[in-house]
Every structure is written in C-alpha cells, then in structure tokens.
Design a protein with these regions (language model features):
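Extended helical coiled-coil dimerization/tether regions that scaffold
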Residues: 68-71, 78-199, 225
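Acidic, divalent-metal-binding catalytic cores of TOPRIM
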Residues: 22-27, 246-432
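Glycine-rich phosphate-binding loops of NTPases
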Residues: 1-97, 101, 118, 369-391
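Short alpha-helical segments and helix-capping/turn motifs at coil-helix boundaries
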Residues: 37-46, 138-139, 236-238, 336-341
Length: 432
C-alpha cells in the first residue's frame, strides 16, 4: 500500500534488471532477470501465490484467428467444450449416445451408403484378396461422447458454412467473444481476487462502426460495480475510430522518449479539465481529431478552411505533414483552451502549435488577446498578462508556438498573393 486513501492505492513494481551477481556489463538477454515487489520496496517480495490471485490475462493482437479456432489446442472454444463435457450427467450422456447411435444406424443402413461401402470392399478384395481384405462400412467417427464433443465446430449462416469461410473480421469477433466467455469463467471461479484483462489492438480487420461497438462493450463491462466481477480491462489501440469515442479521462499515451531511450506514459486522468472542457472535447473529438493522440505533433487551427489549406501549403513547401507525423486539427471555433489542456504538460504532452486570427475589434482589444491569455495561463502562472496589450500578449505567446496573423484568414490570403486564385474560385462558385 502506497497510499491508505481514500481511495486506497496499492502498487506492484516489475523491474527488469541485470542479474545481481553478474560481475560485468550485460551482453544479452540471458544476463537479465526480473523481480516483482510491493510498492517501492525491493525487499517486499511478491511470490507466485499472490501473483496467481492478481493475474494479467492478455489477448494478443489477432493475426490468424481462423487458424487458432481450427486448432483444438489453441482454440478458445476448447475450455467451453470441456466445461460442457464435465457438466453432462449420466442420463444426459446416455440420451446423447442413443441419439448418436440412431443417427449412425440410419446413415449406415441408407442404400446409397451401403452400395458405396460395398464398392470399396469389392475393390479392396480385388487388389489384396479375401484373406487380406478387412470388412468395411461407412459411418460416423468417432461415436464416443467426449470425442464427439471435441469434434464440435462453430458454424455460421445457420450452419451452412464453417469459420474457414468467414471473413477475417467475423473470425476475430468470434474469437473475442469466446475469449471473453473464457475469462468470465475464470473470473467467477473464485480463484482470483482481481483480474487484469488486456486486449491488444481489437480493431484488426473490423469496420469502423464495429471497432467502436467492440470498445464500448469492453468499456461497459466495468460500468456496474454491483454486478461486475473484480475485473479491470486495459485496451491498446492504434485506431482513431476507437480513440474518438474513448472517455477523455481514460486515455494513457505511450511514446518513445529519444532522450532517455525509453517508453514513457502520460495520462489524461488528472488533467485539469473543467466539466465544460470534458463535454466540449467529448462532443467534438471525431475520427479526424482522434488522430491527435497518434501524432508526433499537432497544428491547432480555427476551422475547416485552415484544416484543408495548411497541409496543402506545407506540401507546396516540400514538407508533407503526413510524412512528418503531424496532424492539423480544427477546433471548430476559437476555444483552444480545452485542446491545450489535453495536449499540454498536464496531459499527454504532445508538441503542438496554434494558428489563429487577430480578429480586430474596432477600438477595443483584438479578440485574440483574451484567447491567448487563456491558453498562456495554462502554460505558466502569471497574472501580469491582464496588464499587457494585444501586441505584448502576442509576443509572449510566440515562443510557445502560438502564432497570430494581422487580420483574419481571408484578407491574409488575398493580400498574400492568392487574390487571382480566390477570384477565380468565387466567380466559378457564384456563376459570375
């Protein structure tokens, strides 16, 4: 226990390190070992018994679900069939055996089946003679109950086709359903205090809407604490479709840190969002905005015009943004504050810049002044911003990557050398 709470917080530490008595620099994986201990104290060893009470079940990224489903050893159908086999009492087994025997007799006695078996026997006798030929019949094999149950296979389309004929996405969905049922059995078996279930890249071969449904299913498994078994689900993904429907405080971003040559984690769980921030982000983060979690850098702009023009300008300058891993994200307005909270040092800390209009306001301060003060106060606590004029605020914002034009987008484009092109578009669209 690292914090008695409430809520109480306990921590297990996994440390991968060079072997204690190595006596030299490690040269290969064989020179390393791992230790697991409680909290931050290496002396508080966590043994196998406790680890069995807190298992981590991982469903790896599905690459060939069809092959795994066809293999009795690997199939997630196996534990369900084995459970079925052990649940059958003597009377149920006898009833099934009688039904199988009747079906076997009907099949063996069918005239065409008998004729085919006789043809095979006659040819065998012709080749090897009656002394060496063995009696043959055609029938179902095996007929023992346990063997029959192991031969059960999942069928689709009302039994017309097997899993081998299903699409990759359908096979993956069936695989996940079976693994989920297997996990239910393990979790409710009273042999575990808590289970951590990791689902790796569930989006493989699935259409976007099904990706979202799969995610929402796993999200809902822990929604009702009264009826839900002790289970924590962790889902990893590269899908912006899933990211777009993820609760904004449920995101953990893993990135490579070049300076430390290590993987670092950043979470949105403690990001200082207001209720309005959460509502706005949850409402407006669609698939395109969901890309920001996978970007190396983000350019925040006001609207769709900038979202389309900025990549085109970058392409013309020989700097394709996709090649650089940079996403242009429209905030659909001028409220950049929730996005700066999301991307800033109190969140995943994704490098970002802002491109926004000055928006002159007659004799008053340009509207951009208050806009920039709001985001600058997130980056550094400084109450003196309110005493600065617009130009001073703009100058303070520039080192943070917050850039402002002289007016608004359209006049800037017009005087920036695009007047003729803009005129052509206007005339074409308005049929002038």
């Amino acid at each position: 226990v690292v914090d008695p709470g409430p809520p109480m917080i306990a921590r297990l530490t996994y440390r991968f390190q060079p072997k204690a008595n190595l006596g030299r620099d490690p040269e290969s994986l064989a020179d390393y070992e791992y230790i697991i201990f409680g909290g931050a104290d290496p002396e508080m060893s966590i043994g196998p018994l406790l680890r069995r009470m807190l298992p981590l079940d991982v469903q790896v990224a599905l690459r060939d679900a069809e092959k795994d489903l066809a293999s009795w050893r690997k199939s997630p159908l196996r534990p369900l069939i084995e459970e079925l086999s052990t649940s059958l009492d003597k009377d149920a087994r006898a009833e099934i055996q009688e039904q199988v025997n009747e079906a076997q007799a009907d099949l063996e006695g069918h005239a065409e089946v008998v004729a085919t078996a006789e043809r095979i026997s006659e040819r065998l006798i012709a080749i090897a003679g009656e002394q060496h030929a063995v009696p043959l019949t055609l029938g179902l094999s095996p007929t023992r109950i346990d063997a029959l149950l192991r031969s059960l296979r999942l069928l689709i389309d009302n039994g017309a086709r097997g899993i081998a004929d299903a699409s990759l996405g359908t096979a993956n969905l069936i695989f996940m359903a079976l693994k989920s049922l297997e996990l239910d059995r393990l979790v409710t078996g009273c042999e575990r205090d808590h289970t951590f279930f990791v689902v790796e890249e569930p989006e493989a071969h699935l259409h976007p809407h099904i990706q979202r449904l799969v995610y929402r299913y796993f999200l809902s498994t822990g929604a009702d604490e009264e009826d839900t078994p002790p289970l924590t689900t962790i889902l990893t993904t590269h899908s912006p479709h899933i990211a777009s429907v993820t609760p904004i405080r449920s995101i953990v971003l893993l990135r490579h840190d070049a300076e430390t040559n290590a993987t670092t984690a950043a979470s949105t769980a403690t990001t200082p969002f207001s209720e309005r921030d959460v509502a706005d982000l949850q409402r407006y983060i669609d698939v395109s905005r969901g890309e920001i979690f996978f970007a190396r850098g983000v350019i925040l702009v006001e609207g769709d015009a900038e979202r389309f023009l900025v990549p085109a300008f970058a392409e013309a300058l020989g700097m394709p943004l996709d090649m650089l891993g940079i996403t242009v994200c429209s905030v659909s307005g001028t409220n950049f504050t929730p996005y700066v909270k999301l991307l800033g040092p109190h969140g995943p800390n994704i490098p970002h810049v802002i491109l926004t209009d000055r928006d002159p306001n007659g004799t008053g301060h340009p509207r951009v002044r208050r806009r920039l003060i709001n985001v600058l106060q997130l980056r550094e606590e400084d109450s003196s911003y309110n005493q600065l004029d617009a130009d001073a605020v703009i100058a303070r914002a520039k080192p943070f990557g917050y850039f402002v034009n002289s007016n608004t987008l359209e006049p800037e484009l017009f005087i920036g050398g695009l007047a003729e092109a803009m005129q052509e578009v206007i005339e074409e669209e308005l049929n002038i």
